[in-house]
Regions:
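Short Trp-Ser/Thr-centered turn/loop motifs at beta-strand boundaries
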Residues: 133-147
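Internal, hydrophobic beta-strand segments that form the core of beta-sheet-rich folds
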Residues: 103-132
Length: 147
């Protein structure tokens, strides 16, 4: 009986549908602000849809959302990309430059923008899945520093 249960548990673990579908590899662990690059590899036999977000480390071990999507400007619309089976893509992007607003009505936006543009420790958060409505698998990259 124990052998049967053990075999069933191993089989379920082997056929786990929520296993990691992609692998993220950084070109470095330290980047200047104008040349952040990384590669994403599809480790599955099916097309994988994915969206990349950037998180910044705050005080302690907590990470907060820095951008909704690294492929468009900060706080912009999300872009979902497709990666073919056993394929990979290399991406390079630049963070938004610091913006200074001197008009009173833009004071709140300026304060928020300047706060977000501080250098620090970051990581990529990648949502992926086999279709657009079920991108529920989350994969994190190694942490890296932006100088």
């Amino acid at each position: 009986m124990r052998r049967i249960i053990f075999t069933m548990v191993l089989t379920l673990c082997f056929f786990d549908a929520s296993s990691q579908k992609i692998d993220i590899q950084l070109s470095s662990h330290t980047f200047p602000n104008d040349s952040i690059s990384f590669s994403i590899y599809n480790t599955d036999s099916l097309d994988v849809l994915f969206n990349v977000q950037l998180e910044k480390k705050e005080k302690g071990e907590k990470y907060v959302l820095y951008t909704e999507d690294v492929f468009s400007h900060a706080y912009g619309k999300s872009i979902v990309l497709c990666l073919k089976p056993s394929g990979h893509s290399t991406f390079k992007f630049k963070l938004r430059s610091q913006v200074l607003f001197y008009m009173r009505k833009h004071k709140v936006q300026s304060k928020m923008t300047n706060n977000l543009n501080k250098k620090g420790e970051f990581r990529f958060k990648v949502y992926c899945g086999f279709n657009y409505n079920e991108m529920n698998t989350v994969v994190y990259s190694d942490r890296f520093i932006i100088l």
